[in-house]
Each structure stands twice: as C-alpha cells, then as structure tokens.
Amino acid sequence: LDGKKKVKKQMKSKFSRIISGTMTWGQWGKQLSEKEMTGLIETTYELGINTFDHADIYGGYTTEAEFGAAFAQSAVAREQVAFITKCGIQYPSDARPLKVKHYDYTPEHLRFSLSNSLQNLQTDYIDLLLLHRPSPLMDAAAIHNTLETLMKEGKIRAFGVSNFTPSQIDLLGTKPQVTWNQIECSLTHTDALTNGDLDYCQTHDIGVMAWSPLGSYFKDDNPTQQRLRPLLKELQKTYAATEDQLLLAWLMQHQATIYP
C-alpha cells in the first residue's frame, strides 16, 4: 500500500462504522450530568461504537472538558476508543468573549486549540484532527508545516477536513495527507451525491464522514419528509427496521464507504 492508503486503512480499522457525535451532549443540547455522560459513553461502547466526534467549540468550549471528565470515570480504556476533534472556528461565548465569529488557522491558534483539546479530553493524542470549516484566508503552507510537526510530535495521528470542497482540499496539498472529509450528507440533504464531493473523495482515496446523517427527517415536515415517510414505512415492514436504521443504511450503501 502507498502511504496515503496505509494511513486510511489504519484509520478505518480504528474507527467504528458508526461514529458518535457529541455536539448535543452538553450545553448545546441534552446538558447531561457527568454521571449521565459516563453512562452514555459506556453504553455507546457496548453497542460497538468506539469513535467519538468532538469540536473545540461545542457547548461554547465546554463539552470537550465535560466529556473528558466523564470518560475518566468510565470503564472504557483510552486505547479502546478513537477521539476526533475539530478546530479553526473562533466562536464568541462566555468562555471566549470575542467580538465576532471568525476562522483562525494560524500556527499559533492550531497549537493553542489542540493543546486545549488534549487537556480537556484528558488524553495525550487525538486520533484525527479536522479543520472545521474552510477559511478564505487560510495559509496552506503554514497549515502544512504546523500539522506535520504536530504529527511528528505524536499529538495527532491523522489529519483531515470538514466541509471542504475538492478545490479547497487541493489547495492544502498532499503533505500531510488529507485522509478524511466530514461533510453534510443524508437522505434529506443529498448535495454531496451530485456536487462532486463524494466523487472526489473516492478518486483521491479520502475517507468520508457524514455529519447530521439523519438530516431533517425527524425535525421538519416539508415536502421532502412528506414524500419520504410513506416510503420508509413500507421499508420498515420489509426489513423489520426502524426509520433511523434505514436512513443510516441508505448512507452506508454508498460506494464512498460513508461513516455516519
């Protein structure tokens, strides 16, 4: 295997086929207590999901630390799971009283953000670090050099992007290798199937993760959902499956091997 395929194969073997997103575990959603979060971590792991997706900004910069404290109380060992986190968005919050939301991919901020994530998650390394969203002002060379150094230091195992277009991935170059792109994709948001995102990832051997894989199916009542619901009701009978299982199965059948 060449280097890129080897890295991706190693990551695939590390990540569970379904990934647990943590955005709504804390202040931006369920506001779970430490005990409740510990229980959810253990239950998730028992169900075969060993990969947890974070971002520094979740919960206004609070959810990573809450998860880290809860994970430390769990019966799950660090080497049995994979931590993904994202950086690059500067988000105004009580923890960071900024005047305006903006992007920051300077070497100083990349190091600052990663250091905080490592401390908050109570770990020595991140399995996969993603650039959260593309910035029109990002310095690709500076990003390359910083991430390459962080990988050599053992602080991150792999590097990827989130919400990047094919041309934006090309801008970042090939060293270090972009191994994953986390994009919005679901049965109610199918742009990635036709805008070239999935095609590009397949031809460049880049892994695909889908955020919001259930889409707006359970949230809205627009014509798309109205059209889908009777179809899924019939499929529920055929496959003895729930609606959410069918929505995930649809994604996972794609040849890009999408990880929801």
Regions found by a protein language model. Name each.
Residues 20, 37, 52, 67, ...:
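Conserved, mostly hydrophobic/aromatic
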Residues 118-137:
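Active-site groove signature of glycoside hydrolases
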Residues 134-260:
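Beta/alpha (TIM)-barrel catalytic core signal, keyed to glycine-rich beta->alpha loops juxtaposed to Asp/Glu
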Residues 78-105:
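Structural motif corresponding to the early beta-alpha repeats
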Residues 31-44, 105-121, 165-170:
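Short, acidic/polar
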Residues 32-36, 62, 66, 101-109, ...:
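Alpha-helix N-cap and loop-to-helix initiation/capping positions
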Residues 12-14, 46, 70-82, 118-122, ...:
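Acidic (Asp/Glu)-rich catalytic clusters
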Residues 2-82:
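N-terminal binding-site loop/beta-alpha segment at the start of enzyme catalytic domains
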